[in-house]
Amino acid sequence: LFVCLDTSASMYGTPERISSTLISLLEETAEDLDRDCFLIDFSVSTRAIDLMAKRKAERLKRIGITVVDSTEIPDNSADLSSDGQAHTGRGVWRQPTTTHLPFIGGGTSAKKMMNQMFDLLDNDGLHYVNADVLWITDFLIPNPPQQMLARFKEYKETGTRFYGIRIVRDDDKEPNEWKDYFNWIYTIKYRPLRRY
């Protein structure tokens, strides 16, 4: 499962809280179903996070196993065995991850996120072939170049399912120009808080 999370400024506030809750529920569901879950957050730039690796590291930490990021490898790496265990026998190698949702801010561009999504669908050793893809966004995203949209349709035709969760104000009247590229888009409407 790929989750593409819009972290642009338009998702600040209530949409941010809704998406944070959705990510937590998706993590739990993916773990219950024993499915990989990969998060790509995007605004102008992108960042990819393996949510299942993050959860596994958190569980290991709770039972007393120290997790060592590859960026924190000690200079005296001779103290590590060939299987990556620290000299105490309690270290575990992993790629750096994050422990919280990304910062919300900036504009929105789907180009980099789509390139990263396509790369993972193509080049991840058949691990994510035909994976389900879920976008959590307000879909106020400028259309990328036509060749990217054509590629999007190719994936859809070959079995990849694309879903969206559109988070918008209850008075939103903007048409969703992305709907033809997705199998289904669910809409969550919220009423903005009024301050008197």
Language-model segment annotations:
Residues 26, 150-155:
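Catalytic-core regions built around general acid/base machinery
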Residues 3, 39-41, 133-135, 164-166:
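Structural beta-sheet core signal
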Residues 112-115, 173-196:
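C-terminal helix of von Willebrand factor
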Residues 47, 55-134, 140-144, 165-176:
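Von Willebrand factor
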Residues 29-39, 156-176:
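A short, conserved beta-to-alpha structural element at the edge of catalytic cores
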Residues 14-15, 144-146:
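Conserved ATPase-coupling elements of RecA-like P-loop NTPase cores
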Residues 1-22, 138:
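MIDAS-like acidic motif and immediate structural context at the N-terminus
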Residues 18-32:
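An active-site-proximal "capping" alpha-helix that borders the catalytic cofactor pocket
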